[in-house]
Amino acid sequence: MSQRLAAYENMSLQLIAGEWRVGKAGRDLDVLDPFTQEKLLQIPLANREDLDEAYRSARQAQVAWAACGPSERAQVMLNAVRIFDERRDEIIDWIIRESGSTRIKAQIEWGAARAITQESASLPSRVHGRILASDVPGKESRVYREPLGVIGIISPWNFPLHLTARSLAPALALGNACVIKPASDTPVTGGLLLAHIFEEAGLPKGVLSVVVGSGSEIGDAFVEHEVPGFISFTGSTQVGRNIGRIAAGGEHLKHVALELGGNSPFVVLADADLDQAVNAAVVGKFLHQGQICMAINRIIVEDSVYDEFVNRYAERVKSLPYGDPSKPETVVGPVINAKQLAGLQDKIATAKSEGARVMVEGEAQGNVLPPHVFADVTADMEIAREEIFGPLVGIQRARDEAHALELANSSEYGLSSAVFTSSLERGVKFARGIRAGMTHINDIPVNDEPNAPFGGEKNSGLGRFNGDWAIEEFTTDHWITVQHAPRRYPF
C-alpha cells in the first residue's frame, strides 16, 4: 500500500458535525474480535449532546449539498467506489476482525457495498419531476422530486458495511444528509469506516456524522429528534416495532424504512435437481454462520425426496470446515458474541426436547458453534417458528406441493424465500403463492442486487431498498402550481 493510502487511523474517534472527536458520554465501548476476543478498539461513547450536534450540523450542511448538481454528487459516489477498490484489503480485514466474518463472506460484503455505491452514482440523474394536466384555466401543475432532508440510519452487526451503505450511498446521492448509529458490536464497519471513505471521496463536512452511543442513552433520542425526516433501520422485528411507534406516534412524525427479521423457507419440490438443491441449501444456510436476515431458516422438502435429501444434506454439512474466519478455507466462523452463542445453545436444547432428530451437531469452541442440522421438524417447534440467527437449521416434511406452500407461508415473517424445481412454470406459480418480498427459483434466498427491490412483507418490515425504489424512499413529491392568468374565485 502506498504512503498516500496508509491505513485509516484514529478509529476510536467519531465524525460528529464535521470533526473527528471523542464522544462526551464519559464511558467507553470495548470493540472485540468475536473469534480471538482481542480488544480491537476502545471508543469513548457519544451522548445526546453529541447526537444533537450531529443532527443540527447535518440539517445545515444538507441545503448546500442538495444544491450541488447531479454530476457533482455522482462524482463523490464514483470517488468512493475508487476508494473501495484501493482499500479493498483494509476493508475486508476490518470486516473479518470486527464482525467475525469468514474471508468468503467479507469479500462478498465488500463487493455488495461497492456495488450499491456504484449504483448510487446513477441516481442523481434518474430523479424526474412531472407536469400534470389541470382543469383550472391558466394553471401549470408541476411535481418536483426533492430530498427528504436528513436521514437517520441505524445499522446492524451482521452485514454492517453493506447494510449501512445500502441506505447511506443512495440517500447521499439524492441530496440528503445522514447521521449513522452503528451497532455496538461493529462501530467501525457499520459507520466509522464509511465515514472515512466518504470524507476521502470529497463529501462536504457536516453532511455525514457517525454517532457511536449506547441504545439506552441515545437510542430513542436518535428516532425522536426533530431533525431527521426519515429513519432507516435494519435489525430485529421487536426493535423495529418500537422505532415505528416512535416515528408514527411521537411529537415529530417521520418516514421509516424497516428491514426486520426473517424466517426464510427453502422449498425442495419432488422434481428438483437434488445435487443443486443440496449445494444451495448448504450455502444459503451457513454463509456467515447463518447470521443473515435472508438466510435459510426452514428447509421444506416434498415427501418423495425427503429422506434422500436429508441424508445427502447432512453428509455435506458434516464436511464444512469451521473455526478461524481469517483462513480462506473456513466456511463457519464465530457468532458475534457470547450472548448470541448462549441463545443458540438454548435453541438447540429446545429443538432436542421438542423431538427434532439430530443429524449434525458439535460442541462450541469459544464463539464458534459448529453446524447443527435437525430433521423431522414440525411447524409448531421453536426452530421452525422463530428466526434462527446462527448455524442451526431444521428440515420439515411436506406431503405434497400444496402442503409445502402452506408450510412456507406459516410464518409471521415474509422477507426472502426460495423454491427448487425442474419446471420453471411450476416454480413461478409456487413463487407467486409465497407471501414474501422476495422469492428465488433454483437459487438461495440470500440475494441482494443494487438495482432490484429489497424488502419484506408481514413482520419482516416496511419499504424497499435499491435502484428506483431507493429514489422513492429517500425523496418526496412536492406539488407546485403556477397560475399564469388571474383565476376567477367563487367569492
Swiss-Prot record:
Annotated GO MF terms: oxidoreductase activity, acting on the aldehyde or oxo group of donors, NAD or NADP as acceptor
Keyword Secreted included in the entry's annotation: no
Domain of life: Bacteria
Coiled-coil ranges per UniProt: none
InterPro entries for the chain: Ald_DH/histidinol_DH, Ald_DH_C, Ald_DH_CS_CYS, Ald_DH_CS_GLU, Ald_DH_N, Aldehyde_DH_dom
Catalytic activity as recorded in UniProt: 4-hydroxybenzaldehyde + NADP(+) + H2O = 4-hydroxybenzoate + NADPH + 2 H(+)
A Gene Ontology BP annotation from the UniProt entry: p-cresol catabolic process
E.C. code: 1.2.1.96
Known role: Involved in p-cresol and 2,4-xylenol catabolism. Catalyzes the oxidation of 4-hydroxybenzaldehyde and 4-hydroxy-3-methylbenzaldehyde to yield 4-hydroxybenzoic acid and 4-hydroxy-3-methylbenzoic acid, respectively.
PANTHER family: BENZALDEHYDE DEHYDROGENASE YFMT
Protein name from the UniProt record: 4-hydroxybenzaldehyde dehydrogenase (NADP(+))
Species of provenance: Pseudomonas putida
Lineage of source species: Bacteria, Pseudomonadati, Pseudomonadota, Gammaproteobacteria, Pseudomonadales
